Amino acid sequence: MTRSKRRLILKFNMISFFSAVSLLHYFLPSRKSISMFKKVFVSHAKAPRVDFSRRAGLAARRMEEKRKDATNLWFILYKVLICIYTYSISISLHTPCV
């Protein structure tokens, strides 16, 4: 592999890495959207005219667990993508010239 091919592969990997990171940041739930999501769904889960009912507490806890699970999944996906692109960059840099 020639030096120009290696540079081209490296540039392609970097461009694809940064595009994947920007897409993930675009689709990751922000704190504002999470709080709006919680307000809408937790308020609908509450019993009418009772603020601190057992049902509302359970629903709020379930929503919090779902939010944490979703955030953890996005974080894991983000880390996996970083590992894949880092590995592909290291492979493209360490391929011997023919």
Curated annotation (Swiss-Prot):
Swiss-Prot/TrEMBL keywords: Membrane, Transmembrane, Transmembrane helix
UniProt protein name: Putative uncharacterized protein YHR049C-A
One GO CC term, this protein: membrane
Location(s), subcellular: Membrane
Highest classification ranks of the organism: Eukaryota, Fungi, Dikarya, Ascomycota, Saccharomycotina
Organism: Saccharomyces cerevisiae (strain ATCC 204508 / S288c)
Membrane-crossing segments per the record: 8-28, 73-93
Topology in membrane: Multi-pass membrane protein
